[in-house]
C-alpha cells in the first residue's frame, strides 16, 4: 500500500506533555509510602516509557509486558495475547501501566484484569495517545498525553508493520492512490 506520513504531533509538543505527565504522576504518588512500578507495554511504549520514567520524580522500578491485539495491518483484532509477562512481583506496590496508544481498549482491559489479580496496592494507566472514538471497552485512564481523532498513527515507538518506530514525532499515515 503506497502511503506517506504527515506530522500530527511534533517532537517538542510530545516532550513538553511528557514533562507535565511526569509532574502529575509525581504529585499523585509522592506520599504513597509504597514501592512503585512502571509497567511498559511493549513494543510501542518503549520510547514513551524511557522519557516518562526520567520525568517521574518518585523512586520506581521499571518492568515490561508484551500484549498484542494487532496483526500486521491497520486495524485491531479482539484477540489479546500476552507474549511476555512481568519479571517482578507487583503485590502491594503502586503500579502504573504505561501504554503508547489506547484504541478499542481491549488489550488494556485484559492487561489491567491480569495485573489486578496480582494484588497491587493501586493500579493506574498512563497513555501517550487516546482514541476515545474507537473505544469498545470502558477502561479507566488516569493520565492521558493527547486525545486524538481516529487516524492511523506512527512514530515515537508506534509502528506500521514494524516500520516508523524511529520517528521523533507522531505522524498520521495517509494512503495514496495507486
Swiss-Prot record:
Keyword Metal-binding in the entry? The reply is: yes
- What function does the entry list? Purine salvage pathway enzyme which catalyzes the transfer of the ribosyl-5-phosphate group from 5-phospho-alpha-D-ribose 1-diphosphate (PRPP) to the N9 position of hypoxanthine to yield IMP (inosine 5'-monophosphate). To a lesser extent, can also act on guanine leading to GMP, but shows a highly less efficient activity with xanthine.
Annotated residues that bind Mg(2+) are located at: 99-100
- Its principal location? cytoplasm
Name of the protein in question: Hypoxanthine phosphoribosyltransferase
Give the signal peptide as a residue range, or say none if absent.
Answer: none
Listed EC numbers: 2.4.2.8
Extract the NCBIfam families matched here. HGPRTase
Q: In which pathway does it act?
A: Purine metabolism; IMP biosynthesis via salvage pathway; IMP from hypoxanthine: step 1/1
Q: Which gene encodes it?
A: hpt
Q: Is the Metal-binding keyword given for this protein?
A: yes
What family classification does the UniProt entry report for this protein? Belongs to the purine/pyrimidine phosphoribosyltransferase family.
Q: Which GO terms describe its molecular function?
A: guanine phosphoribosyltransferase activity; guanosine tetraphosphate binding; hypoxanthine phosphoribosyltransferase activity; identical protein binding; magnesium ion binding
Positions annotated to bind diphosphate: 43-44, 165
Q: Subunit notes for this chain? A: Homotetramer.
Amino acid at each position: 500500500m503506497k502511503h506517506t506520513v504527515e506530522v500530527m504531533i511534533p517532537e517538542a509538543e510530545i516532550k513538553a506533555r511528557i514533562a507535565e505527565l511526569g509532574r502529575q504522576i509525581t504529585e499523585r504518588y509522592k506520599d504513597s509510602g509504597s514501592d512503585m512500578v512502571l509497567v511498559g507495554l511493549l513494543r510501542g511504549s518503549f520510547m514513551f516509557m524511557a522519557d516518562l520514567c526520567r520525568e517521574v520524580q518518585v523512586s520506581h522500578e521499571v518492568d515490561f509486558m508484551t500484549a498484542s491485539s494487532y496483526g500486521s495491518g491497520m486495524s485491531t483484532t479482539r484477540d489479546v495475547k500476552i507474549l511476555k509477562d512481568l519479571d517482578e512481583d507487583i503485590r502491594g506496590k503502586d503500579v502504573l501501566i504505561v501504554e503508547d496508544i489506547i484504541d478499542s481498549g481491549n488489550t488494556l482491559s485484559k492487561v489491567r484484569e491480569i495485573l489486578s489479580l496480582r494484588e497491587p496496592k493501586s493500579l493506574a494507566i498512563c497513555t501517550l495517545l487516546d482514541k476515545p472514538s474507537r473505544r469498545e471497552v470502558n477502561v479507566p485512564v488516569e493520565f492521558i498525553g493527547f486525545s486524538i481523532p481516529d487516524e492511523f498513527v506512527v512514530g515515537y515507538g508506534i509502528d506500521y508493520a514494524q516500520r516508523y518506530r524511529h520517528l521523533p514525532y507522531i505522524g498520521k499515515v495517509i494512503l495514496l492512490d495507486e
